Amino acid sequence: MKNIFFVLILLTSFNSHTQNFNNIYADVMKIQQNSYADVKELYNEIVKPTYKDEEKVYAIAKYITENISYGKRAKFPLNTINSREGVCQDYSELFIALCDIAEIKNYYVSGDGRTSVSDIGFYNSNHSWNVVEINNEFQIFDLTWAAGYVDGNNVFVKSFNPFYFNPSPSLFILNHFPDEEKWQLLNNPVTKNQYINQPTYDQSIYNLSLKTGIVRDNNFQI
C-alpha cells in the first residue's frame, strides 16, 4: 500500500469581478412563500428599485435556487413559481421570464451536462442553462445545478452551489457543452470530440477556493 499525494493547481471558484452579494441574498431570504397571480408580482418582491442590473440578476438567481426544487416538468414559469418544482428547462425559462421584466439581455442555452463517468464518450443534449449580458459582458448561470443535486437514490437534495453563478467558461466547459459553439464563451473553443473524451470532474472540486494545495488520500492503493 502506498500513500498517494496529489498536488493540485486550482483556480478560484469565482472569477475576479464577482462581487459579494450577501446583502442581496439576505433580502431574498426574507421573501415569504406565496402563490402568485403572475410573474411580475413575484418580480416586484425579488427586485428592489435600488438594485443595479447585476444585483437584479443575482437576486433573481438566488430566489430561484432557494425556492425551486428539481422535480416534475412545470411547462410554464408561473407553474414553476407556484408548484415550486421543475426540470432544468423550467429553471431556465423562469429565469428568462424574470430577466425579461428587468429588461436584461438573456439567452437560453441547451446542451450536454455531464454528471457521471458513464457519460464519457457520449453526447446528449439533455440540459439547459442561461447566459446574461451585463455591461457588455456575458455571464453564465446554471440554476438547476446551483440549486442542488440528485443523490444515489435519485432524490433531489437542496444544496446551494454558488459556483454555478457566473462560473469561468474555462471551468464550466469541463461538464457543460452547449449545442451552439458560441456559448462556450471561449477564445479557443473545445471540439465535441475533445469534450466527450475528457474526464468527468466532480462538482465539489469547484467549491475549493485554494489556489494551490495538497490533497492526501491515505486509503488510495496501487
Language model region names:
Residues N3-F14:
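Sec-dependent N-terminal signal peptides
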Residues L11, I46, I64-N67, D179-E180, ...:
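Alpha-helix boundary/capping residues
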Residues Q19-V87, E93-A102:
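Secondary-structure boundary elements
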Residues E93-L171:
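Hydrophobic/aromatic-rich core segments of domains that either
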Residues D151-I222:
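Alpha-helical and coiled-coil interaction segments, frequently adjacent to or embedded
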